[in-house]
């Protein structure tokens, strides 16, 4: 099987649920800065220089 000319990106958008307040929010899987909950301010995703550490419950991976 031939390799595609333009590879698909490995990064995704994620629908996550805050553990503290239950707010659902869409975040990027490879963030450059800390992503905080819009309601309570809890950290949802921390950057690591690549794929972020998700500290919330992942509900869905968006295409």
From Swiss-Prot:
Transmembrane segments annotated in the record for this chain: none
Entries under InterPro entries matching the protein: Ribosomal_eS27, Ribosomal_eS27_Zn-bd_dom_sf, Ribosomal_zn-bd
Entry GO CC: ribonucleoprotein complex; ribosome
Residue positions binding Zn(2+): 18, 21, 37, 40
Cofactor: Zn(2+)
Domain of life: Archaea
Keywords for the protein's UniProt record, in alphabetical order: Metal-binding, Ribonucleoprotein, Ribosomal protein, Zinc, Zinc-finger
Zn finger (C4-type) location: 18-40
Pfam families the UniProt entry points to: Ribosomal_S27e
An individual GO BP term: translation
Entry GO MF terms: structural constituent of ribosome; zinc ion binding
Family as reported in the entry's similarity comment: Belongs to the eukaryotic ribosomal protein eS27 family.
Identification of the protein by name: Small ribosomal subunit protein eS27
Organism: Pyrococcus furiosus (strain ATCC 43587 / DSM 3638 / JCM 8422 / Vc1)
Gene that produces this protein: rps27e
């Amino acid at each position: 099987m031939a390799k595609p000319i333009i590879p698909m990106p490995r990064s995704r958008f994620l629908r996550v649920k805050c553990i503290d307040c239950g707010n659902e929010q869409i975040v990027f899987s490879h963030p450059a800065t800390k992503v905080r909950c819009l309601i309570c301010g809890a950290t949802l995703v921390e950057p690591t220089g690549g794929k972020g550490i998700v500290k919330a419950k992942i509900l869905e991976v968006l295409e």
